[in-house]
Curated annotation (Swiss-Prot):
A GO molecular function held by the record: NADH dehydrogenase (ubiquinone) activity
Known function: Core subunit of the mitochondrial membrane respiratory chain NADH dehydrogenase (Complex I) that is believed to belong to the minimal assembly required for catalysis. Complex I functions in the transfer of electrons from NADH to the respiratory chain. The immediate electron acceptor for the enzyme is believed to be ubiquinone.
Family listed: Belongs to the complex I subunit 5 family.
Localization terms from the record: Mitochondrion inner membrane
Lineage: Eukaryota, Metazoa, Chordata, Craniata, Vertebrata
GO biological processes: ATP synthesis coupled electron transport; electron transport coupled proton transport
Annotated source species: Oncorhynchus mykiss
UniProt cross-references to NCBIfam families, sorted A to Z: NDH_I_L
Protein name: NADH-ubiquinone oxidoreductase chain 5
Membrane topology, from the record: Multi-pass membrane protein
Name of the gene encoding the protein in the UniProt record: MT-ND5
Gene Ontology terms: cellular component: mitochondrial inner membrane
Length: 612
């Protein structure tokens, strides 16, 4: 075996061993020590992160991609399923990022969840999720990818409903699993199509044998799968609802890792899509619609976690736009940079929520810059990185995406929506900074504001460093596969920056407008549209069940009771009997001449018929 291949495969084996060891220790009959989460889980993930740097450095030095097939799961005359791992640009970069972010979040969770009696089980769930995510990222066949896909889905369900004593948490968990199940149907049907028509689930073989085939049908299934998992328009309501889970869950699953699985699926299978204009156009338009709609919803939300959740959905829409542009590597770059600052935004939110006695309404915060300077500074850095401030992590990916959009020959509709959404991103990010950090405190003086704990500050600082330098590090070391347009007019080059600055100016104007009321009864149509999430939950979650109930009631009362038991049954029998009675009673009226005439005619007719 080639030394590079040996290093890559043994590193992955070492990572899995380190992550699975704490899970094995839980199988013993004796209960775990109360510090098990810190001594076993956090240490294992820290060590796994350090091990994952080895294949990264080898890849940077050698630039070789490797596929390792270890074991045959199923071997028939026509179909093979192997246990195979793919070490390429995507899996080698994403694995250390996932481990680094998880390490920071778990350290934060040790403080956030310290009073929870089942904290060890919580950490075990997070560890299981991480293993499923790494299986998904490194899989080289669809079956293995599907195992990771379902693994992250079920862990999401368990972690959203962690506080299952609350009805909202149970509802949100059920909602997440149902929406994801719709997406899973698309993935399962696509896999069935690939197995039937391409006779393989190995990704390399699928690429080779799909040349010349019309792949529109399976690609639509894959896009449906990505729509469900990555909260694209139509299947997006589960992501803001998922904020019912603990903040570390939101930071890990619903910002940086699990929600990008749908986008990652499309990136991994992008060679199937690159020549299919239907699939690319669907991705482009769906992503543009998602990024604008969810950014619009974020503008007027008051729950700090909901704002960050909608911003996640908006950034996922931007990644989908990039896939529609035929630029999967840019989408992956945005996944990597987005993971750092979005996880950090959630951790800062969690720290502030905990400090204010579980208060999540930004209108009841304020003045946090003086009370929690480190957390507020990191919140500001994260928000600025999200808006695409030059030289922070988000700038390197967002700017490249908008430049690619500007210089492409695709429809201007998607470009306009994306630029609007980028402007809105600046508005809601500055709104969070304005309400949370600036001004005077708007909460009770008894709030236990305290950030002087290494378990709070260290993870946020680590992610802050990632939010500052990750974009530069990744773009410096990995050359793009598609050469971008190197020369363009100044106004195109500055487009992303200009819409961001205009967004910041609009945000300042809106902030001043919120303190004034020009009319006694102001018209709030646009505000209500944004605040009520475009009336989407009201229509889908209320109107659809109401229509079904009305239909059921109509069938039960109108069709069965009214029609069958009343009209067809008793009344119809009565009408039929009446007709027969009326007919026979009309004959018996004592008209002798008529009877004799009829008798004579009928007799004559009978005789004539007999003679002839």
């Amino acid at each position: 075996m080639h030394p590079t291949t040996l290093i890559l495969s043994s590193s992955l084996l070492m990572i899995f061993t380190l992550l699975i060891y704490p899970l094995i220790t839980t199988l013993t009959p004796t209960p775990q020590h109360k510090n098990w989460a810190l001594t076993h889980v956090k240490t294992a993930i820290k060590m796994a992160f350090l091990v994952s740097l080895l294949p990264l450095f080898v890849f940077l030095d050698q630039g070789t991609e490797t596929i390792v097939t270890n074991w045959q799961w199923m071997n028939t005359t026509t179909f093979d399923i192997n246990l195979s791992f793919k070490f390429d640009h995507y899996s080698i970069i994403f694995t250390p990022i996932a481990l680094y972010v998880t390490w920071s979040i778990l350290e934060f969770a040790s403080w956030y969840m310290h009073a929870d009696p089942n904290m060890n089980r919580f950490f075990k769930y997070l560890l299981l999720f991480l293993i499923a995510m790494i299986i998904l990222v490194t899989a080289n066949n669809m079956f293995q990818l599907f195992i990771g896909w379902e693994g992250v889905g079920i862990m999401s369900f368990l972690l959203i409903g962690w506080w299952h004593g609350r009805a909202d948490a149970n509802t949100a968990a059920m909602q997440a699993v149902i929406y994801n199940r719709v997406g899973d149907i698309g993935l399962i049907l696509s896999m069935a199509w690939f197995a039937t028509n391409l006779n393989s689930w190995e990704i390399q073989q699928m690429f080779a044998s799909s040349k010349g085939l019309d792949l529109t049908l399976p690609l639509m299934g894959l896009i449906l799968a990505a729509t469900g998992k990555s909260a694209q328009f139509g299947l997006h309501p589960w992501l803001p609802s998922a904020m019912e889970g603990p903040t570390p869950v939101s930071a890990l699953l619903h910002s940086s890792t699990m929600v990008v699985a749908g986008i990652f699926l499309l990136i991994r299978l992008h060679p199937l899509m690159e020549d299919n204009q239907t699939a690319l156009t669907v991705c482009l338009c769906l992503g543009a619609l998602t990024t604008l709609f969810t950014a619009t919803c974020a503008l007027t939300q008051n729950d700090i976690k909901k704002i960050v959740a909608f911003s996640t959905s908006s950034q996922l829409g931007l990644m989908m736009v990039t896939i529609g542009l035929n630029q999967p590597q840019l989408a992956f770059l945005h996944i990597c940079t987005h993971a750092f600052f979005k996880a950090m935004l959630f951790l800062c939110s969690g720290s502030i929520i905990h400090s204010l006695n579980d208060e999540q309404d930004i209108r009841k915060m304020g003045g946090m810059h003086n009370l929690t300077p480190s957390t507020s500074s990191c919140l500001t850095i994260g928000s600025l990185a999200l808006t695409g401030t030059p030289f922070l992590a988000g700038f390197f990916s967002k700017d490249a995406i908008i430049e690619a959009l500007n210089t492409s020959h695709l429809n201007a509709w998607a470009l306009t929506l994306t630029l609007l959404a980028t402007s809105f991103t600046a508005i809601y990010s500055l709104r969070v900074i304005f309400f949370v950090s600036m001004g005077h405190p708007r909460f009770t003086a008894t709030a236990p504001v305290n950030e002087n704990n290494p378990s709070v500050i260290n993870p946020i600082k680590r992610l802050a460093w990632g939010s500052i330098i990750a974009g530069l590090l990744i773009t410096s070391n990995f050359l793009p596969t598609n050469t971008p347009v190197m020369t363009m007019p100044t106004h195109l080059k500055l487009a992303a920056l200009l819409v961001t600055i205009s967004g910041l100016l609009i945000a300042l104007e809106l902030a001043s407008l919120t303190n004034k009321q020009f009319k006694l009864h102001p018209t709030l149509t646009l505000h209500n549209f944004s605040n009520m999430l475009g009336f989407f939950p009201a229509i889908i979650h209320r109107l659809t069940p109401k229509l079904n109930l009305t239909l059921g009631q109509t069938i039960a009362s109108q069709m069965v009771d009214h029609t069958w038991f009343e009209k067809v049954g008793p009344k119809e029998l009565f009408q039929l009997t009446c007709l027969m009675v009326t007919t026979t009673s009309n004959i018996q009226q004592g008209m002798i001449k008529t009877y004799l005439t009829l008798f004579f005619l009928s007799t004559t007719l009978a005789v004539l018929l007999t003679l002839t």
